[in-house]
Amino acid sequence: MKNQSSTITTQPARPAVISGTPEGSGPGRLEVNVIFTDPQATVAALKAAGALARDLGACIQVRAAIPVPYTLPLEKPPVSVGFLQSLLYRLVSRSDLHTFEPSVHLYICRDRIETLVRVLGPNSLVVISGREHWWPSAERRIAKALRSKGHRVVFVGLKRDAKSDLR
C-alpha cells in the first residue's frame, strides 16, 4: 500500500524544516502534545499546555495533521504547506512558550485520527481545544479516539462567542 502521509517538522526557535515519515517520539523528556484544530482553538490549547508544561517540566509538541481528500494527490494538499507552516509558526511564536522548547510537526495525510494515533507515543499527554456544542464536534471525536487508544486527553472547551487572541 502506498504511504498515506508525510511529515514536516519545524523548531520555532530555529525555523528549519525537516521532512520525513511520521513516527512516534522516543523516550526522554515528558511531552505535552497540542493538536492543531483551528487557529483560535489552538491558541487556547497552547495556553493550557503552557500551564501543564510549567507544572510538569515538560516540552510542548504542536501536531497538525492536515487531511488531503482522495481526489487530490498527497503531494498537493488543498492548503499550501508553506502557508500552514507560517500559520503554525506564528501561533507558537505568539504564545510566549519559548522556555518549553516548542516544536511544530506538520503531517500531510489521508486520515487525521489514524495519523495522530501513529505519531503519538504510548500514553501521551494530549491537549486539544474546540467549541462547546451539545453534538459531537470533530475535535471531540478526535479526543474520544485518542482516549480510546490509551492517551491522556485534556479538552479545552471554547465558548461560542469567545473572542480571538489572534491579531
Which role does the model predict for each range below?
Residues M1-S25, L97-V126, E132-H133, R141-V153, ...:
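Structural beta-alpha unit
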Residues K47, Y89, S137-R141:
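Residue-level marker for well-ordered alpha-helical positions
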Residues A45, L72-E75, T115-V117, A138-E139, ...:
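Short, well-ordered secondary-structure micro-motifs
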Residues I35, L106, P136:
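Active-site-adjacent beta-strand anchor residues
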Residues E23-E75, A145-H151, F155-R160:
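Small/aliphatic-rich secondary-structure junction motif
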Residues N3-Q4, I8, P12, V62-L87, ...:
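Acidic, proline/glycine-rich short linear motifs
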Residues S80-H105:
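A glycine-rich helix N-cap at a beta->alpha junction
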